[in-house]
């Protein structure tokens, strides 16, 4: 999925991390169609990133995977991008929703 740096938001006071992405709609027969979706992570206590130029809002990242691991009483959710870039979310509970917005193409 394609993500622009300026479409990644962490709202610390609400403990919400938002990611707007343009992705292939693989869950239907329209796999060649692109759709814009919002990926929302809730109950996020901390966010760390590496190899992402936050001062370049138009930089495009390619999300290639997500995984998580348990670290004591918390979880670390890893969002992995091409070029060895990643974002790590720390949370006590994993709660994620993916909401389709509209067709991109």
For every predicted segment, state its role:
Residues 1-105:
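Surface-exposed, interaction-prone regions used to assemble/regulate multi-protein complexes
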């Amino acid at each position: 999925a394609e993500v622009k740096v300026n479409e990644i938001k962490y709202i610390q006071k609400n403990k919400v991390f938002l990611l707007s992405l343009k992705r292939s709609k693989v869950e239907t027969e329209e796999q060649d169609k692109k759709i814009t979706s919002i990926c929302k992570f809730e109950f996020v206590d901390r966010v760390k990133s590496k190899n992402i130029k936050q001062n370049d809002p138009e930089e495009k990242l390619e999300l290639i995977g997500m995984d998580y691991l348990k670290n004591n009483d918390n979880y670390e959710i890893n969002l992995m991008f091409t070029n060895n870039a990643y974002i790590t979310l720390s949370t006590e509970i994993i709660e994620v929703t993916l909401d389709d917005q509209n067709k991109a193409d």
